[in-house]
Swiss-Prot record:
It comes from the Bacteria. This is DNA-directed RNA polymerase subunit beta. The RNAP catalytic core consists of 2 alpha, 1 beta, 1 beta' and 1 omega subunit. When a sigma factor is associated with the core the holoenzyme is formed, which can initiate transcription. Keywords: DNA-directed RNA polymerase, Nucleotidyltransferase, Transcription, Transferase. GO terms for molecular function: DNA binding; DNA-directed RNA polymerase activity; ribonucleoside binding. Pfam families: RNA_pol_Rpb2_1, RNA_pol_Rpb2_2, RNA_pol_Rpb2_3, RNA_pol_Rpb2_45, RNA_pol_Rpb2_6, RNA_pol_Rpb2_7. DNA-dependent RNA polymerase catalyzes the transcription of DNA into RNA using the four ribonucleoside triphosphates as substrates. Its EC number is 2.7.7.6. SUPFAM superfamilies: beta and beta-prime subunits of DNA dependent RNA-polymerase. The gene is rpoB. Coiled coil: none annotated. Belongs to the RNA polymerase beta chain family. CDD domains: RNA_pol_B_RPB2 (cd00653).
Length: 1374
């Protein structure tokens, strides 16, 4: 068992000294959790069918089934589904260009009911047919959270969309010129019709369905069963009047009078005037009226006029309706009412301030009379031009909001809806109810009346994340819905014909829907694989674009902006520059999704000012209820918040609060940023714009030949490397049994081995694999034979990782000084030594493909027999016509020989005879071989040959298969070797000292077995020993059986592999054979390459200077890179300067350790110095855990520099950096290097003259990256090449081998110079004058250098365009 220690295998080799002021409370969660969890929940592959929860595939099937035939006598029920084992593993899919997927098989029952004996209440089953039906293939997620689609690795990006529910907003006064706020509400379901309510400038309330024509809202209220009386009763309170002979008595309600201007004298019971006419009624007046016991107030007649009747007034004698609800009172109407003897009158109470008559006014313009008429009106709006029959009208209205098949609010929508309208329960039906609609209209009217607040749509409580699982489920549902339609139509036939479920179900729609989504959806993206950081960021990306999301053009400023709720959920720094800024975001480091898809972030609970270790995840909505302190708040020894006031956040605002009011505290200062931003040291000293560039450019760093750990990191490097899946980690603890460049074999610890399984883990390393960006993925072992490992230890480094830490660049000695103008405007000056040492050399792998197709004239052939090629040009091709692995090729070299049949030419009899005799075949085929492109060269590192089923394999293909089988057999042999060794060890322990009944080499009965005897017998003959004890004999037998079983299973595995390799390959239609050749290209650093630091300090290499000309230090050390100091102050990314200082300290310490090792200092002295480095400041490390050997091994690793971690927002202070510099450079050393007092600057000498520069220069080490914008990929020149078909102008761009555009402004420049002939040449023969350019060619051949410019083709295009408009235009030559 590996020793229990806080340090892993790689950490023991190199501990990163951290300056973090507080220990981590919560480990950084697994960074691909969101993707992995979402897809696991979608598939539920490892859950027993009976125990599956209703989500993902299960929910999709449940929504589509049961399917019932039109007559109701046949039904198809879904029982369960299961997923088959994928036919090919991930690596095989990548090589063969297949999709890594699993077949879905659903068990369905076809139930046929007996027509005769069935009644409408109970149906009698006639027969049931059960069958498993193939339901398409579902792509599987790899361990790294990506998908392999058609052989390429893709990522499904999560989408941030508006949560279902109800939203209230106003137009911010933009619609109407007066600036009046128009309020609106919108009910957004997960699936189904949107329902909008909106006020117009006249305060009439309208509704619209799916953004169609708007209609008065009372039509909808009538359609849901309300009549005008109940509508008014729902929205208004009533004023009660008692009609007198003249005037009336108003029932007195104090709060309704307050603030009104009295239109008449208001008196109390005694007739005393309390409020005079035209005075405003105040709270004092209403109090006097109450105290005087006033219950009614006399009001004059004109006070009643214009008031609105609240309910129908019916004549008690005749039953005639005298006044309808919502009718206005007029003098005539009052007269009529008095005449009919009506005494009590109820009118609605409205006022200008907070009780508007909006619904009443809307009801007035609504012409529908009853519920049916209202539904007809809605039908006409939804289906204009169709005759509204009663059935159709009712069916449509039901289908709009009340039918679960067509309308689904979803759990999230219902939860948000209920929360918004003030219900306590979070669950409920997934369709709307009448109460729901009424509640929304009530809230909207209240808003217009000035009560309540509108919603903020950019609040993360109103936006939720749709993950891979949910997106895939929606696609699967679409496919199933199409199947459902088809099955429903055919179910009727199942009664007459003996059909089985698979005859009815065609899985094509599902496959098509999934294929379309995974292959072509906007959210299914080609994985960014430049380096591990790019991969991990891509999988954690959250996009607001995509189907059902925003579009770039429509997204305004608010959506893109940083919102307070982004804190700890979405990174405020990492987002692309350009049109997508703010629409594509990255998940913050600790963020996760809750069950509803809202982003949550963790906080530590604070109780009475004491910070506990309890951690709660809060969503944006919950967070608003609490006061949350920052992670760097100072705590005393007991963990209490110190100081009177603590900096905290309340409802998104930063405030200072007393310690006892704080309820939560951040878990880490890095909580607010994403992975990429958290890898930038001293981020807190950089301007946000530059930090954004720094985080984005880290993702473009190319993996170099020998990755080097950053001297100054942040402590996240290890987590990011391990979670990205680039490094290889041990699945189980154990001892390394065998290591070479391609595989690591680990013998698993006994306590971790599962009974009945092989106790061996074999890790096959990836060698020179091409990434999506053509960079090189390559793994190197970092363990030795005999090393003890624990589970999770890093055992092999991948691209851009060094000892299990992300290492995207190299540590370079940087000097900040101008150098002869070569670092003007962000240019970078580099020493030749950097290039000579291959520090920035990267390997790029290109894939070249050739296909032999079946053409009309016959099959193409891959062959060495190519017409018109000399033997010299063919000498690197093998007999199959395919290049050897290891060949170095130049532009134009043949990689794969291929000939295509030409059209048959008619032959004379003589030619036919000659051809029959000599077999001359060359003339009827043309050479279409695969050649190396212009401008690329390299070494062939791999060749793959794919052959269609039924076509003879060539020798090369056979050899590739044999090699692959040999490799596979090696793995199996290793496993077998360890299993056998293990078994024989157990047998030895079992038999030693036991009594035998006999055995090989004439073992006498009753003899004790000893080790010497066992050693003399062949191990496989040990099984022939017959132990006397029954129990021992059975154990021996069981070991023998287990061994045989293992051998048998290995043979089966080998056979399966052989079958897989020898079966024909799936190739595109018409392709008989396909050859892929992989070229490795070495790219050295050269002028024109883009480089950058991690702080947004980017530049282009301007010159590579001989090392002897570079500025050097007093001890002769030359600088590696010279940067312009003017690039720092205006850009405000000071983090780079601090990084340089701290890197300088790390290097100095490394050199001191190196000196100690060189003079073979005692381990105690080393320990003392390491203690001083690690434990004098910042976080303490437990070096006592390491043995002397481990200390020595670590010291050797540290000679290149001591790595530091300066966590984001909790980094090293200026004091700490100064202390480290003092420790690294004692006075004597500082003097020898010519350092200043602070050790941050040095006096440099000019490499060319040897003179000392007069001022000291800032020098130190910075982690500098080479980016994926390489000059080799961009540089391009053309003499003649392809032309566009219509305009006859040269194409553009390197890919098309295009020309340089001579644009409008360039034409002006030539005009300004008066260079008429140059201009004519540019606009004619060098562009689109077809005759002219052939003429020029002829003239050059003749040796005349004359130009005859003709008519540019673009003029002819213009003439044709004008003619197409029906205008005849002719060119007359004068």
């Amino acid at each position: 068992m590996a020793q229990t220690s806080t340090y892993s295998y790689t950490e023991r080799k190199r501990i990163r000294k951290s300056f973090g002021s507080r220990d981590s409370v919560l480990k950084v969660p697994y960074l691909l959790q969101m993707q992995r969890d979402a897809y696991t929940a979608f598939l539920q592959a490892d859950t027993a069918p009976q125990k599956r929860s209703i989500e993902g595939l299960q929910a999709a099937f449940n929504s589509a089934f049961p399917i019932v035939s039109h007559n109701g006598f046949v039904e198809m029920k879904f029982v369960e589904y299961n997923l088959a084992k994928p036919a090919f593993d991930v690596r095989e899919c990548q090589t063969r260009g297949l999709t890594f997927a699993s077949a879905v098989r659903a068990k369905v029952q076809l139930i046929i009911y007996d027509r005769e004996s069935s009644t409408s209440q109970s149906k009698v089953v006639k027969e049931v047919k059960e069958q498993e039906v193939y339901m398409g293939e579902v792509p599987l997620m790899t361990d790294k959270g990506s998908f392999i689609i058609n052989g390429t690795e893709r990522v499904i990006v999560s989408q941030l969309h508006r949560s279902p529910g109800v939203f209230f907003e106003h137009d911010k006064g933009k619609t109407h010129s007066s600036g009046k706020l128009l309020f609106s509400a919108r009910i957004i379901p997960y699936r189904g019709s949107w329902l909008d309510f909106e006020f117009d400038p006249k305060d009439i309330l309208y509704f619209r369905v799916d953004r169609r024509r708007k209609m008065p809202v009372t039509i909808l209220l009538k359609a849901i069963g309300l009549n005008p009386e109940s509508i008014l009763a729902n929205f208004f309170v009533n004023d009660n009047f008692r009609l007198m002979d003249s005037g009336a008595q108003l029932e007195f309600v104090p709060e309704r009078l307050r603030g009104e201007v009295a239109r008449f004298d208001i008196t109390d019971k005694a007739g005393k005037v309390i409020v005079a006419k035209d005075k405003r009624v105040t709270a004092r007046h209403t109090r006097e009226l109450e105290q005087s016991g006033t219950t009614h107030i006399s009001v004059p007649e004109d006070f009643l006029i214009g008031r609105v009747v609240a309910r129908n007034i019916v004549d008690g004698d005749t039953g005639e309706i005298l006044a309808k609800a919502n009718e206005e009172l007029t003098e005539a109407l009052l007269k009529k009412l008095r005449a009919a003897g009506v005494q009590d009158l109820q009118v609605i109470y409205t006022n200008e301030l907070d009780q508007g008559a909006y619904i009443s006014q809307t009801l007035r313009i609504d012409e529908t009379v009853d519920e049916f008429a209202a539904r007809v009106a809605i039908y006409r709006m939804m289906r204009p031009g169709e005759p509204p029959t009663e059935d159709a009208v009712q069916a449509l209205f039901q289908r709009l909001f009340y039918n679960p098949d067509t309308y689904d609010l979803s759990r999230v929508g219902r939860m948000k809806f209920n929360a918004k309208i003030g219900r306590d329960e979070a669950t409920g039906p997934m369709v709307l109810s009448n109460d729901d609609i009424l509640a929304v209209v009530k809230i909207l009217v209240d808003l217009r009346n000035g009560k309540g607040e509108v919603d903020d749509i950019d609040h993360l409580g109103n936006r939720r994340v749709r993950c891979v699982g949910e997106l895939a489920e929606n696609q699967y549902r679409t496919g199933l819905a199409r199947i459902e339609k088809a099955v429903k139509e055919r179910l009727g036939q199942a009664e007459q014909e003996p059909l089985m479920p698979h005859d009815l179900i065609n899985s094509k729609p599902i496959s098509a829907a999934l294929k379309e989504f995974f292959g072509a959806s906007q959210l299914s993206q080609f994985m960014d694989q430049t380096n591990p950081l790019a991969e991990i960021t891509h999988k954690r990306r959250v996009s607001a674009l995509g189907p059902g999301g925003l579009t770039r053009e429509r997204a305004g400023f608010e959506v893109r902006d940083v919102h307070v709720t982004h804190y700890g959920r979405v990174c405020p720094i990492e987002t692309p520059e350009g049109p997508n800024i703010g629409l594509i975001n990255s998940l913050a480091l600790y963020a996760r999704l809750n069950e509803y898809g809202f982003i949550e972030t963790p906080y530590r609970r604070v109780v009475d000012g004491k910070v506990t270790m309890e951690i709660d995840y809060l969503s944006a909505i919950e967070e608003g209820k609490y006061i949350i302190a920052q992670a760097n708040a100072t705590l005393d020894a007991e963990g209490r918040l110190t100081g009177d006031l603590v900096s905290a956040r309340e409802k998104g605002e930063s405030t200072l609060v007393s310690a006892d009011r704080v309820q939560y505290m951040d878990v880490s200062p890095a909580q607010i940023v994403s992975v990429a931003a958290s890898l930038v040291p001293f981020l807190e000293h950089d301007d946000a714009n530059r930090a954004l560039m720094g985080a984005n450019m880290s993702r473009q760093a190319v993996p170099v030949l020998r990755p080097e750990k950053p001297m100054v990191g942040t402590g996240i490097e290890r987590v990011a490397a391990v979670d990205s899946g680039t490094v290889v980690t041990a699945n189980r603890g154990g001892v390394v049994d065998y290591v070479d460049a391609t595989r690591i074999v680990v013998r698993v610890n006994d306590d971790e081995a599962v009974a009945g399984e092989v106790g061996v883990d074999i890790y096959n390393l990836i060698k020179y694999q091409r990434s999506n960006q053509n960079t090189n993925i390559h793994q190197r072992p970092i363990v030795k034979k005999g090393d003890k490992l624990a589970k999770g230890d890093v055992i092999a480094d991948g691209a851009s990782t060094d000892l299990g830490e992300i290492a995207i660049g190299q540590n370079m000695l940087i000097a900040f000084m101008p150098w002869n103008g070569y670092n003007f405007e962000d240019s970078i000056l580099i020493s030749e030594r950097v290039v000579a040492e291959d520090r920035y050399t990267s390997i790029h792998i290109e894939e070249l493909v050739v296909m032999a197709r079946d053409t009309k004239l016959g099959a193409e052939e891959i062959t060495r027999d190519i017409p018109n090629l000399s033997e010299q040009q063919l000498n690197r091709l093998d007999e199959s016509g395919i290049i050897y692995v290891g060949a170095e090729v130049q532009p134009g070299d043949t990689l794969v020989g291929k000939v295509t049949p030409k059209g048959e030419t008619t032959l004379t009899p003589e030619e036919k005879l000659l051809r029959a005799i000599f077999g001359e075949k060359a003339s009827d085929v043309k050479d279409t071989s695969l050649r190396v492109d212009q401008g690329s060269q390299g070494t062939v590192i791999d060749v793959q040959v794919f052959t269609r089923e039924g076509i003879q394999r060539d020798k090369r293909a056979q050899q590739i298969i044999d090699d692959e089988l040999k490799r596979f057999r090696l793995d199996l042999n290793d496993q077998l070797r360890i299993v056998e060794a293990d078994a024989f060890d157990r047998i030895e322990k079992l038999l030693t000292g036991r009594v035998a009944n006999g055995g090989p080499q004439k073992l006498a009965k009753g003899t004790k077995i000893d080790k010497a005897y066992l050693a003399s017998v062949e191990k496989f003959h040990w099984f022939d020993i017959r132990p006397a004890e029954e129990e021992v004999a059975t154990q021996l037998e069981s070991i023998k059986n287990a061994l045989e079983q293992t051998r048998h299973s290995f043979d089966l595995a080998f056979e399966e592999k052989r079958k897989k390799l020898t079966q024909g390959d799936e190739l595109p239609a018409g392709v008989l054979k396909m050859v892929k050749v992989y070229l490795a290209v070495k790219r050295r650093l050269q002028p024109g390459d883009k480089m950058a630091g991690r702080h947004g300090n980017k530049g282009v290499v301007s010159k590579i200077v001989p090392v002897e000309d570079m500025p050097y230090m007093a001890d002769g050390t030359p600088a590696d890179i010279v940067l312009n100091p003017l690039g720092v102050p205006s850009r405000m990314n000071i983090g780079q300067v601090l990084e340089v200082h701290l890197g300088w300290a790390g290097k100095g310490m490394g050199q001191r350790i190196g000196d100690m090792l060189q003079r073979e200092a005692k381990t105690a002295e080393l320990r003392k110095f390491l203690e001083e480095i690690y434990n004098s400041r910042g976080r303490k490390e437990e070096l006592s855990q390491l043995s002397d050997d481990e200390i020595l091994a670590m010291a050797r690793e540290l000679t290149s520099g001591v790595p530091f971690a300066s966590p984001v927002f909790d980094g090293a202070s200026e004091e700490e950096i100064k202390d480290m510099l003092k420790l690294a450079y004692p006075d004597d050393l500082a003097q020898a290097k010519g350092l200043t007092e602070t050790r941050t600057q040095a006096y440099l000498y000019d490499g060319r003259t040897g003179e000392r520069f007069e001022r000291p220069t800032t020098v130190g080490y910075m982690h500098y990256l080479k980016l994926h914008h390489l000059v080799d990929d961009k540089m391009h020149a053309r003499s003649t090449g392809p032309y566009s078909l219509v305009t006859q102008q040269p194409l553009g761009g390197k890919a098309q081998f295009g020309g340089q555009r001579f644009g409008e402004m360039e034409v002006w420049a030539l005009e300004a110079y008066g260079a008429a002939y140059v201009l004519q040449e540019m606009l004619t023969v060098k562009s689109d004058d077809v005759q002219g350019r052939t003429k020029v060619y002829e003239n050059i051949v003749k040796g005349e250098h004359a130009i005859e410019a003709g008519m540019p083709e673009s003029f002819n295009v213009l003439v044709k365009e004008i003619r197409s408009l029906g205008l005849d235009i002719e060119l007359e030559r004068s």
